[in-house]
Swiss-Prot record:
Name under which the protein is recorded: DNA-binding protein RHL1
Gene that this polypeptide is encoded by: RHL1
Biological-process GO terms, alphabetical: DNA endoreduplication; root hair initiation
Keyword Ion transport: no
Chain intervals with Low complexity compositional bias: 230-246, 260-274, 344-355
GO cellular component: nucleolus
Gene Ontology molecular function: DNA binding
Functional summary from the UniProt entry: Component of the DNA topoisomerase VI complex involved in chromatin organization and progression of endoreduplication cycles. Binds to DNA. Required for endoreduplication beyond 8C.
High-level lineage: Eukaryota, Viridiplantae, Streptophyta, Embryophyta, Tracheophyta
Deletion phenotype: Plants have no hairs on primary roots and have an extreme dwarf and seedling lethal phenotype.
Tissue/organ expression: Expressed inproliferating and endoreduplicating cells.
Major location category of this protein: nucleus
Length: 355
């Protein structure tokens, strides 16, 4: 019974601590929402960062993730930090609870940041790109983050051991070192540029696309409405060049070639009839060249060619016969038939001679 009573008392004390932590957590969460560190709805970025050369080089490669034994937390501060040198910026305390505290060290004293552990819907990771462009290594993967939404100035430990809230010194309000740069990472957004230089306006070199509300364009079923989507025609900077179409024909007009293969008998007849003229002519000779040669000749040449016509007619007839004759494939049956015809012809000649 004593143990039961003692456990009840301990449970009541633990419940009071849990209630205090939950109240502190709710207060810090509402404060982060008021300061626009967090948002219930997904944020719409007005300006997106351009991908670097390494990201474009590793486009489409595999992301390799190694197992992690230690829990890693992502910090979200209410402002931008610009450390002068690489060193420890502070100490993290009460990490075992849901409301950790971070102490930032300054030459004038310390700053106390109150935070709470939250589990966002977005996932954050850090990537390490290889030089060859084969793969990408995922160093850290953050499922949870610590949002520091409230900051106190507590001074030094000797002056303020109880860590009561003090006024910020005037020296921290004035920026002494101006060599820091917030153009990389999340500092490249348009909101950071407006805060850094509100008086100087920047002229964008690229034309921004028109903003279209998705709620007006989408129907109740989630489909796009054709009536509300406006498409602007592209602007032609240079006038189009008109090119006249040209028909390119692969045939040679006015030229006729003779590729017919003549038989052995026709070739022998041609060699006997026209040994002087046909041997000198090329195999592939266009008719235009022959016409020009005949026109350039004198009257004597014309009569001579006319006298040679009857001699060339039988040779041309043999050519036509060779063209009209069907090509017969040399097979074994054809060869045997030819051999039988030859033997029959020789036997007839022998019988006639004997008679």
């Amino acid at each position: 019974m004593v143990r039961a009573s003692s456990s009840k008392k301990g449970g009541s004390k633990g419940g009071d601590k849990d209630d205090a932590e939950s109240k502190q957590r709710k207060r810090l969460k509402t404060l982060a929402l008021d300061n626009q560190l967090l948002s219930d709805s997904p944020a719409k970025s007005h300006s997106s960062l351009k991908p670097s050369k390494q990201v474009l080089k590793h486009h489409g490669t595999d992301i390799i993730r190694k197992s992690q034994r230690k829990n890693r937390f992502l910090f979200s501060f209410p402002g931008l930090l610009a450390p002068i040198s690489a060193a420890t910026i502070g100490d993290l305390d009460r990490l075992s609870t849901k409301n950790p505290v971070l102490y930032l060290n300054f030459p004038q004293g310390r700053m106390k940041l109150f935070g709470t552990i939250l589990y966002p819907k977005n996932r954050y990771l850090t990537l390490q790109f290889s030089r060859g462009g084969k793969n990408v290594l995922c160093d850290d993967y953050f499922d949870n983050m610590i949002v520091f939404s409230e900051s106190w100035w507590i001074g030094t430990k000797e002056e303020n051991p109880e860590e009561a809230r003090l006024d910020f010194p005037k020296e921290l309000a004035q920026a002494e070192n101006t060599e820091f740069d917030f153009q990389g990472g999340a500092g490249g957004a348009a909101s950071v540029k407006k805060l850094a230089s509100p008086e100087i306006g920047s002229q964008p070199t690229e034309t921004d696309s028109p903003e279209v509300d998705n709620e007006d364009v989408l129907s109740e079923d989630g489909e796009f409405l054709d009536d509300k989507i406006q498409v602007t025609p592209p602007v032609q900077l240079t006038p189009p060049v008109q090119v006249t179409p040209v028909r390119q024909s692969q045939r040679n007009s006015g030229k006729k070639f003779n590729f017919a293969e003549t038989s052995s008998e026709a070739s022998s007849g041609e060699s006997e009839g026209n040994t002087s003229d046909e041997d000198e002519k090329p195999l592939l000779e266009p008719e235009s060249s022959t016409r020009s040669r005949e026109e350039s000749q004198d009257g004597n040449g014309i009569t001579a060619s006319a006298s040679k016509l009857p001699e060339e007619l039988p040779a041309k007839r043999e050519k036509l016969k060779s063209k009209d004759s069907k090509l017969v494939q040399a097979t074994l049956s054809n060869l045997f038939k030819k051999a039988e015809e030859k033997t029959a012809g020789t036997s007839k000649a022998k019988s006639s001679s004997k008679a």
